[in-house]
Amino acid sequence: NTHTLPGLGRLIDVSRPDWIEHVQKTNFSNYVKGEQFHDQMRDVLGDGIFTSDGERWKMQRKVASRIFTVSSFKAIITQTIREDCALVEKLIETYAKEGTVFNLQELYFKFTLSSFVKIAFSQDIMSLSEPDRPDTFGDAFNYAQKVLDMRFVQPWWKIAERFNETGRKMRAARKIVEEFTNNIVEARREESDAMGEKSKPESGRKDLLDLFMGYRSSDGQRLSNQQLKDTILNLMIAGRDTTAEALSWMSWHMLTKPEVYSRIRREIDTSLDEDGEQAGLEIDYDVFEQHTAKLSTFQETLRLHPSIPKNIRRALKDDVLPNGGPRVRKGDLMLYSDWAMARNPDIWGPDACEFKPSRWIDEETGSTVKYSQFQAHFFNGGPRLCLGQKLASYEVVQLIHHIFAKFDLELVDLGPKKSAGFDKVPDYLNSLTHP
């Protein structure tokens, strides 16, 4: 379980539920993302929640948690998602009439970016209503994430990026990303300063940016524009990439496995009215977890294709992992891979590598099975448990319901490629959030 890597030091693979629980919960304060992780991410993600530790992380999590409440779901989130689902439907309807082959994953990224920007920043970036507009931000952000991911296996990346093509493209991508966040923050700051306290009602709708702009430290200081921009980009990774990737993998499994597709279609059909019309397309937040066919397929998708397939922590002090685990020395890196754990028969049984949504359904009650957050670790665990897991789950259930109630989709021929026992596999690129 231990390795030594140049530039990184001693690395311990802790891809076991009991060891991950120790690192992420039992002895949480001893394991941090660390300065090296922060240094590799700083030029893009700054001091945001994705890269931070300690008090800085606690503050951001506390503020962000205030948007993920039941009242926010009912007042803001469900309506936004429904509106964007209708725009997705309109686009697919156009493609269907024209007989056009389209990129479903690209559409999912437009959907999650649009809905998250509306929820978090109250802005419509028109990615769905004007889909032919160049997605300069998305392309730049994707490239930046790819480079950030590569840095983990390139100890001399700082020197190399000064002179190579990757560094030149990275600087150009970073400039585009910074302009995107600058526009959001500066426009809101000007509006807030102009309106004064009138812009901060005690009641009424507040988005994530409102909450962070309203934050004051113990000495009364507000967050700087740079801190707000860091916050935006970190939340963007969580709100755009992870859900779009899960939707893509889920749809791929549905369209390549007739039994999965049929089960979801049966569930959809039972919830539509007699004419199969709009009344059955909108799912209330209070009951979305009753859609067990879609929810279990989503969970099985996340199990085999976790949004964060690998992660690390650095030990601040000496320690010993439980249940006969190795000794940990100060400075050691803990590596865990949810992707590898999902395929481990000691954790998930002899059928670990199979795509089986049924493992998430209780045969007697028909309800969803709850696994330990350190076994089903795709939403993280302990104090860093994903704040947006309910948002992502609702978003996926609602959009899949909306699309497949109206359309029969087919994959285009993927060619003869093989991987990991599958006859055909989709193309994808590495990033911080993609396996």
Curated annotation (Swiss-Prot):
Entry GO MF terms: heme binding; iron ion binding; monooxygenase activity; oxidoreductase activity, acting on paired donors, with incorporation or reduction of molecular oxygen
EC code(s) of this entry: 1.-.-.-
Induction line: Expression is strongly induced under conditions of nitrogen starvation. Expression is positively regulated by the cluster-specific transcription factor rua1 that recognizes and binds to the specific 5'-T/G-G/T-C-G-C-A-T-A/T-C/T-C/T-G/A-3' upstream activating sequence found in all promoters of the UA biosynthesis genes.
Pathway: Secondary metabolite biosynthesis
SUPFAM superfamilies the UniProt entry points to: Cytochrome P450
One Pfam assignment: p450
Presence of the UniProt keyword Protein transport in the record: no
InterPro entries cross-referenced by the UniProt entry: Cyt_P450, Cyt_P450_CS, Cyt_P450_E_grp-I, Cyt_P450_sf
Keyword hit for rRNA-binding: no
EC primary class: oxidoreductase
Cofactor: heme
Effect of gene knockout: Results in complete loss of ustilagic acid production.
The name this protein goes by in its record: Cytochrome P450 monooxygenase cyp1
Organism: Mycosarcoma maydis (Corn smut fungus)
Encoding gene (name): cyp1
